Amino acid sequence: EFGIPDVSGVEMVPARVKWFDKSKGFGFANVYKSHEDIFLHMEILRHFGFSDLQAGEAVVLQVVDGPRGKMAGAVHSWDNIS
């Protein structure tokens, strides 16, 4: 089972979805002003109420260090962040 990381105190950063493949259960996003790929896992999306993401979609991420590099520990809708 995929664990949901603790993101308390982790900065929220604006990002854009690079690609997401629902059938594979993962994808990548880029944080604004950075070319580093941020891993997006389907279980994290589901935990935060998403069922899918589209390429180019604006989101807000809380990025943590995952087993293979930077990953989204939390995904928030751009529209719900004030």
Give residue ranges: language-model regions.
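OB-fold/S1-family single-stranded nucleic acid-binding modules
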Residues: 65-82
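Ubiquitous "structural anchor" signal
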Residues: 33-35, 57, 64, 77
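Beta-strand secondary-structure signal
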Residues: 14, 60-62
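Short nucleic-acid-contacting surface segments enriched for D/E, G, S/T with interspersed K/R
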Residues: 47-60
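S1/OB-fold single-stranded RNA-binding interface
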Residues: 11-43, 72-74
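Short boundary/loop segments of OB/S1/cold-shock single-stranded nucleic-acid-binding domains
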Residues: 1-13
